[in-house]
Amino acid sequence: MKLRVLGARQGESRDSHFGSLLVDDSLALDAGGLTASLTLEEQLALEAVLVTHRHYDHVKDLATLGFNLLVRRRQIPVFCSDEVREALEATLLNPQIWIDFFAEPADAPTFRHAPISAGSTLDLAGKRVRLISVPHSVPTLGVELASPDGRRLLYTSDNGPSAAASWATSRPDLLVTEVTYPNAQPSAADHGHLTPRLLAAELAEFRRLRGYLPRVLVVHVNPFNLDEVAAEVAAVAADLGGQIEIAEEGGVYDV
């Protein structure tokens, strides 16, 4: 599997984008930095979008993706929970603000809702996909992808303390998880997020449960704290003896 990081930050600027990952150029995981990071041709080549939860920084570019596809009369399946679809239609895709692409055009809606929930398994874009529940401030799904050659990617989306028990239901080769704030802001836990210190605790628990540490790619870092978080994550890697790194915007990684 090839993983391309379209957005790896909890903040948007010229140099940073909200969360979005692209797997093998065809499957988008979350849509925070989707259209902002893809050419029109790359957007038209997407086979599906999977949305893990309703927060704005994970759904923002559904509004622009839908419009670009509408112009070309394309349809795409959007895999998300019923709760996420309802939130989108009440807010971002409310006709008072934009276009409800789940309903328009009436004869062939741009977005085809494919409902998912924790425990769901499906075959998607040549991968076996399994959804797990992860602890966050709103209902959130983690995504395990298994390729035909047996390689596994686990994308946890946003999650906070006690996440390791969910992670341990998988045996990933690459774990993509979050660190939002530095250790100086322990209140991150109150909002369902991790600091480097909290990440270290979850990884130690994962190793206790599973007997190994996967390679770890850290996303969702607030860009104002990037240097501080990077230094603290490097210290975690040294302490645990693991391969743990901050994801680069636009970075491409082999799983």
Label each residue range with its predicted role.
Residues 1-42, 141-157:
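Conserved beta-strand hairpin/beta-sheet module of binuclear metal-dependent hydrolase folds
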Residues 3, 21, 29, 53, ...:
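Divalent metal-coordination and catalytic microenvironments
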Residues 29-32, 47-57, 79-81, 154-159, ...:
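Active-site neighborhood of phospho(di)ester-bond hydrolases with catalytic His/Asp-centered motifs
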Residues 35-80, 173:
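Active-site metal-binding motif and surrounding structural segment of the metallo-beta-lactamase
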Residues 38-43, 64, 122-125, 165-168, ...:
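Short amphipathic alpha-helix with an adjacent loop that forms part of the alpha/beta core around
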Residues 75, 79-111:
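Acidic/polar short surface loop at catalytic or gating sites that assists cofactor/ion binding
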Residues 113-171:
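Catalytic core of the metallo-beta-lactamase
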Residues 160-251:
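Cap/insert and terminal regions of metallo-dependent hydrolase folds
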